[in-house]
A protein has these predicted regions:
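Phosphate/pyrophosphate-binding catalytic cores of soluble transferases and nucleic-acid-acting enzymes
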Residues: 1-314
Length: 314
């Protein structure tokens, strides 16, 4: 079956956005951003959201659609992004999914049936109260009893997902491991072709990440953080957890220097890129384009185009 959707994936700073726009021109597509933080308004610099010039006239969806004070879940993202995908297909265009948030992209392609529960639900509120009163230790211990597989996968500091796993159990009687296993057995909602971007040498990827962070600082990342503070964005907002914002919030509060914040952002970004690659390697269907010392976009675009054309895309 000819793929309905093109996915452009890869770790941060590998040129996904540029490739996605080029493929949209080539295959009559529109870009759907699959980035858990580009959904927020007023955070264009730190999330590397595309500028109007970088969009090159290609419609972009799921960029700057939410207030930073809102808390978004993967379930909500998939629900709203799916509306975009369906609309693009209905108009005879091709959705080009671009981003590095692997869970969001995989869930959208699979049409994941999310378990019950929401961030504002009664069960979540009770668990949140327990977290504040008891700390994460007892909650993680409870999860280890209920769903040892899930507990083993989660980092002890990943409070959000620990609470989610417990919430699923309390509301459905099914562990999140059982739910995910059942979901994976279902046929995917969409047929997709995957293009993966990275570097042959991991050191080059790290260098590109450092250069990107330096460029964000020059563009005004600190000023963007200060603007969010001035707008009254509460320190508990999920948006502050984005790499770059969390560290520069600390600098704005005087808890560290700007120089220390920059180095921390670079470190966290490199660690995130490593996790992204680990996730992507789970998918054997990705057609990888590995850059040399610098990205060769004309050559990479030709490579991607030939691969997609061979799959039947026109």
């Amino acid at each position: 079956m000819i793929p309905q959707i093109i996915c452009v994936e890869g770790p941060t700073a590998t040129g996904k956005r540029k490739m996605g726009v080029a493929l949209a021109h080539r295959f009559g597509g529109e870009v759907v951003s699959v980035d858990s933080m580009q959904i927020y308004r007023g955070m264009a610099i730190g999330t590397a959201a595309p500028t109007p010039e970088e969009m090159e006239g290609i419609p972009h969806h799921m960029v700057g659609v939410a207030d930073p004070a809102e808390s978004w879940s993967v379930a909500r993202f998939v629900s709203e992004a799916d509306v975009c995908v369906q609309d693009i297909l209905r108009r005879g265009r091709r959705p080009i999914l671009v981003g590095g948030t692997g869970l969001y992209l995989e869930s959208l392609i699979r049409g994941t049936d999310f378990a019950a529960g929401s961030a504002g639900g009664v069960t979540r509120q009770r668990l949140q109260q327990r977290l504040e009163q008891e700390g994460i230790g007892p909650l993680l211990a409870e999860l280890q009893t209920i769903d040892p597989d899930s507990a083993a996968r989660l980092h002890p500091s990943d409070e959000k997902r620990i609470l989610r796993a417990l919430e699923v159990w309390y509301e459905t009687g099914e562990t999140i491991t059982q739910h995910d296993r059942r979901t994976r057995q279902q046929p995917p909602r969409y047929q997709a072709a995957y293009i993966g971007l990275s570097f042959q040498d991991r050191a080059q990827l790290r260098r590109r990440i450092d250069l990107r962070v330096d460029e964000m600082v020059r563009q005004g990342l600190l000023e963007e953080v200060q603007a969010l503070l001035a707008a009254g964005l509460p320190p508990t907002a999920t948006a502050w957890q984005a790499i770059g914002y969390k560290q520069f919030l600390a600098a704005a509060d005087g808890r560290c220097t700007v120089t220390e914040a920059i180095e921390e952002v670079k470190l966290r970004s490199r660690q995130y890129a490593k996790r992204q690659l680990t996730w992507l390697r789970r998918n054997p269907d990705i057609h990888w384009i590995l850059w040399g010392e610098e990205p060769n976009f004309p050559q990479g675009l030709q490579n991607a185009t030939e691969y997609l054309t061979a799959l039947g895309l026109r």
